[in-house]
């Protein structure tokens, strides 16, 4: 059984169908890239999976459970986390605190504990700080040395890495990354590819939206291509890159993607 099974999924905004009867199966341990021209429906798909949008029709089955009507916080608690195309860190919190924010769905201490700070709450917070530092260490020396600095002081690339670390803080099984290498130079991009592979090797499944086709070809186990909300191709990166429908969707003429 697929970890995530998207069945006949449609999402309409008035008369516009952003997703049209989409089928997609994501197996545990895969890195799958979702690509397509601007307006293809990629971010809409992520918004549906993460519970920001409720699908017009179809099913979104994760670990055997239909998530289609669950709110975003419940989907996070089930084991799905995401980053966003536009960076959403808390600039006036420290790097460490930003990661700890991502752990809220796993906290055992309730509202009374937040006010009265019993020993159990203090122990839990100490454990979360240790875990947050472990997550920062996944990114080498990019984040951990800045753990006590405000996130506003991070470089653009490191703010993107911080978003990934915060998403990992909720202990997901499926991680959705929306353009994780956007704005990065080639060296930063190569480093991020290695870090995403390392995350997969920790037992996670990764679904990526990415516009840099060199990244897609390098990192993906499989590639799914959307155009106007319809899946037009799916398969191994090399096969998809040479698919005439994909070339037409991107370039409108005979060419080869690279």
What are these regions (language model features)?
Residues 1-258:
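Glycine-rich phosphate-binding loops of nucleotide-dependent enzymes
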């Amino acid at each position: 059984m697929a970890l995530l099974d998207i069945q006949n999924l449609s999402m309409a905004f008035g008369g516009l169908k952003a997703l049209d009867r989409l089928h997609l199966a994501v197996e545990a341990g895969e890195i799958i890239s979702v690509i397509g021209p601007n307006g293809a429906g990629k971010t809409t798909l992520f918004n549906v999976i993460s519970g920001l949008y409720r699908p017009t029709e179809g099913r979104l089955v994760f670990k055997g459970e239909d998530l289609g009507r669950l709110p975003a916080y419940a989907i996070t608690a089930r084991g799905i986390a995401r980053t966003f195309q536009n960076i959403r860190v808390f600039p006036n919190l420290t790097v460490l605190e930003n990661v700890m924010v991502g752990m809220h769905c796993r906290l055992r201490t309730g509202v009374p504990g937040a006010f009265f700070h019993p020993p159990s709450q203090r122990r839990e917070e100490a454990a979360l700080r240790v875990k947050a530092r472990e997550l920062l260490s996944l990114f080498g020396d990019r984040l951990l040395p800045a753990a006590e600095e405000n996130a506003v002081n991070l470089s653009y690339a490191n703010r993107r890495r911080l978003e990934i670390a915060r998403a990992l803080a909720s202990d997901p099984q499926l991680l959705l990354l929306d353009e994780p290498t956007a704005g990065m130079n080639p060296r930063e991009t190569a480093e991020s590819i290695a870090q995403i592979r390392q995350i997969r090797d920790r037992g996670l499944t990764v679904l990526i939206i990415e516009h840099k086709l060199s990244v897609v070809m390098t990192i993906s186990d499989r590639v799914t291509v959307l155009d106007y909300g319809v899946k037009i191709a799916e398969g191994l990166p090399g096969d998809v890159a040479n698919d005439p429908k994909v070339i037409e969707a991107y370039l409108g003429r005979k060419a080869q993607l690279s």
